[in-house]
């Protein structure tokens, strides 16, 4: 018998040391990753984010089933990811299978693992990757030091020269809640909006995972707590639990997608069936 393929999906058994993930200091993909964040941190202003909400949140661009949207990610390699250089569709199934092993009783959680990055389809419909992928962070207030490449990529951002949004709270009230905070625009917020628009029935915990899984300064570094309300604090453990599968299931051992599809199609049919508006 050959090696157990499930090892590729089990965070606790993964052959890659956890300290090797999210290496933003060197590596074969460093230049690509840095350049993506440089563009993001230069152009993602408060006004830019408001504009993208107007463009994408009405979900009037195209119609596509969830599985077809996942398949479309075969064409996308995330240029902000220092860990992988293969299509995003494989990462979807890796994440879902990792969750399935650890949480076999939570089918909605498994589905979130599968679909969490599907908002990246924006990159296949005219958006540059710096407006789609990568870590997210609030705009309209001080950029915290935990943001990736904080000290080397924001010098060209006009908001950095505006005193109003450069305080700890900026345009927000203390403990206003993340629902009232404008995040840098990307696939997290877009997919959240698609889920709400199409009345998908994924539980609130899953919607939080979708909306904030890329908000590393919050869920992994503990920043921006001054903007969080009680609900955000209650949901944080769920986002943290999701993160370990999102991050540590990445592997060059790619899953047998065709074998897995029927099971995950049944979850799609349960929580976000049919053709969706994007």
Swiss-Prot record:
Of the GO CC terms on this record, one is: cytoplasm
Keywords for this entry?
Cytoplasm, Iron, Metal-binding, Oxidoreductase
Q: Where does Fe cation 1 bind?
A: 91, 116-117, 246
Give the gene that encodes this protein: miox
Pathway given for this chain reads: Polyol metabolism; myo-inositol degradation into D-glucuronate; D-glucuronate from myo-inositol: step 1/1
A Pfam family annotated for this chain is MIOX
Q: What is its main location?
A: cytoplasm
Record text on cofactor binding: Binds 2 iron ions per subunit.
| Record-listed E.C. numbers | 1.13.99.1
- Coiled-coil spans are none
Residues engaged in binding substrate: 22, 78-80, 120, 134-135, 213-214
Binding residues for Fe cation 2: 117, 187, 213
- Please state what the protein is called: Inositol oxygenase
Gene Ontology MF term list: ferric iron binding; inositol oxygenase activity
Essential cofactor(s): Fe cation
Q: What is the lineage of its organism?
A: Eukaryota, Metazoa, Chordata, Craniata, Vertebrata
The catalytic activity, as recorded, is:
myo-inositol + O2 = D-glucuronate + H2O + H(+)
Q: Which biological process, per GO, is one annotated for this protein?
A: inositol catabolic process
Cell compartments where the protein resides: Cytoplasm
InterPro entries per UniProt: Inositol_oxygenase (IPR007828)
Q: Which family does it belong to?
A: Belongs to the myo-inositol oxygenase family.
Q: Which domain of life is it from?
A: Eukaryota
């Amino acid at each position: 018998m050959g090696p157990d393929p499930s090892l590729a999906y089990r965070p606790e058994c993964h052959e890659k040391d956890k300290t090797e993930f999210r290496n933003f200091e060197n590596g074969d993909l460093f230049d690509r990753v840095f350049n993506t964040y440089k563009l993001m941190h230069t152009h993602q202003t408060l006004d830019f984010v408001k504009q993208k909400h107007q463009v994408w949140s009405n979900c009037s661009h195209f119609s596509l089933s969830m599985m077809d949207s996942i398949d479309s990610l075969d064409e996308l390699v995330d240029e902000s990811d220092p860990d992988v250089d293969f299509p995003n569709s494989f990462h979807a199934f890796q994440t879902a299978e990792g969750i399935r092993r650890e949480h076999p009783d939570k089918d909605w959680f498994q589905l979130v693992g599968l679909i969490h990055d599907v908002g990246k389809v924006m990159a296949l419909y005219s958006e540059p990757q710096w407006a789609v992928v990568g870590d997210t962070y609030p705009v309209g207030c001080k950029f915290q030091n935990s943001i990736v490449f904080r000290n080397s990529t924001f010098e060209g951002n006009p908001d950095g020269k505006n005193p109003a949004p450069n305080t700890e709270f900026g345009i927000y009230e203390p403990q206003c809640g993340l629902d009232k905070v404008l995040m840098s625009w990307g696939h997290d917020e877009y997919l959240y909006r698609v889920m709400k628009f199409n009345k998908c029935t994924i539980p609130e915990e899953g919607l939080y995972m979708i909306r904030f899984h890329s908000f590393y300064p919050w869920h992994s570094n503990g920043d921006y707590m001054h903007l969080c309300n009680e609900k955000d604090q209650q949901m944080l453990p769920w986002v943290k639990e999701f993160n370990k599968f999102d991050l540590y299931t990445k592997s060059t051992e790619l899953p047998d997608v065709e074998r897995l599809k029927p099971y995950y199609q049944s979850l799609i049919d349960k929580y976000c069936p049919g053709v969706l508006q994007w």
